[in-house]
Structure formats: C-alpha cells, structure tokens
C-alpha cells in the first residue's frame, strides 16, 4: 500500500514537471515571437518616484524612459512613428506628441489656445489645477488634425485642425450620458463614430459642421456590453485599424466581434476574482492582443495593481508578463 502511494506521488510529480517544462517552453517560444512586435508604450508614476512615458520590452519585461512628461491617455499614430497625449505639467499644458525614433517632445497646442477655440464654440473653459490631472481626454490623430474629448464626462468630442497658423475646432459629437472611448471610421464616403458607454456600444453618422447638441435619436446600437461596476476612465473597447472588428470583455471571456458578419469569436477565458480588465490593445499587425488586469483597489480608490497579459490570436496561447507594484500608477497604454 505504501509503495503504491509513493508511486502515485512520483507519477504526479513527473506529470507536473512535464507540464511545467511544456508551459515554460511554450511561453518562451511565444515571447520570442511577440518580441519582434513594436514596443508597448505607457505613461506611469512608479512607487519609487520615477515618472514619465516609457517603452516596454516584452522579451525582457524591462522598460526604458523616453520622456519625463506623462502623456495621459496616449495613443500611437497610424504608422506608430509617434504618440499623442494630453500633458498637464507646470512646464506645459495641452496636447503634445512624442517622436518614437528620437524621443523628441513637440507641443501641438497649448491649453490656452484650446480654451480660446472652446470659447468660440460655447464650451466651458478648462482650468489647469496642477500636475496629475487633465480634462482633455483620449487625444488621437485623425486625418489632417486631431480629435479628443472635452471635460470630465468625455461626452463632447472635438476635431482640431490648423490652417494658415490658425487653429479651427468643431464639435463632432455630443452625448447625453457619460462616454468612455470612441473610434472614428470612414464608411461609404461617410464618417461614423463608435462610442463606448457604460452598458452599450453605439455608432452614429457624423455630418461635418453639424453640432446636434444632445440629440441621441440617431444612435444605432452595435452591441450590448455588461455593465461594469468599475471601469477605466478611457474605456476598454478596442477596434481593429480598419474598424471592422471590436474587442470586448464579457466575464469570463474576451471576444472579437465582427461588425460585418455580426458574429463573435472567442479569444480566451480570463476569470476575475476581485479584479477588472482595464485595457485591450491589438498589436500593430493585429496578430496579438494585449490586456491588463487590475486587482480591485482598497476601498475603491484610484490605485490599481496591474498585471500585463498577451494572447496569440491564432493559437489562443496566453502569457502573463509583469505584475506591477501596488503603487505603480498608469495613465495611458498603447501597443
């Protein structure tokens, strides 16, 4: 009897060892493939006091500072040669970009110039209250200009262009409730905006030069999504570059939803135990999906301990990368 128990234990140890070796080799192989992708970029303030914007190397799980400025809710340009973000520091307030080749910081427009444009549209002025917060949200490159959300509720989306050294700003969209994220697509010679709210993803056609105030009658429901008890301020919805697919989470699964076929594809299970998913990002070639899982903060404050994950969208293999420290605070991530 004793001999059988020993044999059983040894067998279990052998099986677990083989499984561990297999998982390690699989993870290493996947990391080798993913390391050829463009770097993940994020802005953060770390527990040790270091802060700014950083490039994250997937293979080594190390990061390199590329700017002392925090780029809030940053996003890559279409060619990934630069990033754009909101900056709120004593040295500069407004929208700026960072060249990813030589790390050159370039102001795009100051907060004072933005406020001058906003005043012409009858929008409330944004006041600088010091480093660490901003009311200019989700800035993105778009066509020959830039888009962004104005003020806390993010329900006013603006389009900014410059002609003959003069800035021009128009309101593309207003929404009655709170808005979390948005994407704009050119569809059949028209512009369509996709909006993530607390429980739905909508789309609507945009009419250049037309501000329909708070008229939501022409919003078209794309997808019902689970109501989040806790949601990242810039949302978690992600869309492919051609805006034909979107990624969303419905516990315990991450899905890719095809807007043309209206079919969903299961990506992977991610069970959450006192946790929330805060970011979903395609890789540049859309072969992989990066996402973050945050431990529920103590007393529901704004401090969230993040875990980084990457999924191979073909094999559906998943690897966990860095588990960050409790007081490492992230302000924007893109891939």
What does each model-identified segment do?
Residues 11-335:
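Sequence signature of WD/YWTD-type beta-propeller architectures
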Residues 1-14:
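N-terminal Sec-pathway targeting helices
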């Amino acid at each position: 009897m004793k001999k059988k128990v020993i044999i059983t234990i040894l067998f279990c140890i052998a099986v677990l060892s083989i499984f561990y070796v297999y998982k390690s080799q699989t993870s290493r192989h996947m990391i080798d493939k993913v390391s050829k992708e463009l770097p993940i970029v994020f802005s953060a303030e770390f527990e040790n006091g270091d802060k700014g914007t950083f490039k994250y190397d997937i293979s080594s799980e190390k990061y390199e500072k590329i700017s002392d400025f925090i780029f809030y809710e940053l996003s890559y340009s279409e060619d990934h040669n630069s990033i754009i973000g909101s900056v709120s520091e004593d040295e500069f307030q407004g929208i700026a970009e960072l060249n990813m080749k030589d790390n050159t910081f370039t102001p795009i427009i100051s907060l004072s110039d933005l406020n001058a444009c906003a005043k012409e549209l009858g929008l409330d002025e944004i006041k600088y209250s010091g480093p660490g917060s901003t009311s200019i949200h989700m800035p993105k490159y778009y066509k020959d200009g830039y888009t962004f959300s104005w003020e806390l509720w993010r329900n006013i989306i603006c389009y900014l262009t410059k002609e003959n050294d003069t800035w021009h700003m128009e309101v593309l969209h207003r929404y009655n409730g709170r808005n979390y994220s948005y994407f704009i697509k050119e569809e059949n010679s028209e512009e369509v905006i996709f909006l993530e709210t607390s429980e739905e993803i909508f789309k609507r056609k945009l009419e250049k030069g037309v501000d329909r105030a708070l008229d939501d009658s022409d919003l078209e429901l794309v997808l019902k999504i689970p109501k989040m008890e806790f949601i990242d301020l810039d949302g978690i919805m992600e869309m492919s570059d051609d805006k034909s697919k979107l990624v969303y989470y419905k516990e315990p699964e991450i899905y890719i939803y095809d807007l043309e076929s209206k079919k969903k594809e299961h990506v992977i299970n991610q069970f959450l135990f006192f946790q929330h998913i805060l970011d979903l990002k395609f890789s540049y070639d859309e072969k992989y999906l990066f996402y973050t899982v945050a431990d529920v903060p103590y007393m529901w404050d704004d401090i969230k301990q993040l875990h980084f994950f990457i999924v191979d969208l073909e094999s559906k293999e998943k690897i966990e990368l860095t588990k960050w420290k409790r007081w490492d605070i992230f302000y924007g991530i893109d891939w």
